[in-house]
Amino acid sequence: MTLTRESELAAHGFFWEEGLHFPLTRKELKALIAAALEEDDTKHDITTAATVLSDRRARCRLVSRQSGVISGLPLAYEAFEQLDRAVTIRVEQEDGARVEAQTSVMFLSGHARGILSAERVALNFVQRLSGIATMTARYVDAIAVRTGPDVRARPQA
């Protein structure tokens, strides 16, 4: 799946449909990410400013370190987009998908400074939410009722 702009995201129901894929309104999601980026002080990222030329372009890939359930991609997408409106983002897994270790989840291409400055905020959300989603999936799998094909419904008395 390749999604690069808000209209395409909305058309695919990626995260603007409240309650369906992500329980925040578009306005709330944008405000949450803006607050996280401000808290991270990305506007004063002196390391990136000192080591990366302003016109430098970069490509990067978000890859899962271990198997689990990926979550938080809408937040990562928004973090990268808020710091570089010209960034191209290709979402390669659905939010909520089960992934194996070393699975490519998202590909980015854009200004290196924007990508590097948004990276920590994006990864913090994805790692935290993926951990919660993975643990939840494990609990659901553990308590799921398993029935074989020979189980039949009994008539009620």
Residue locations for each model-derived region?
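Acidic/glycine-rich phosphate/pyrophosphate-binding loops and surrounding catalytic core
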Residues: 2-157
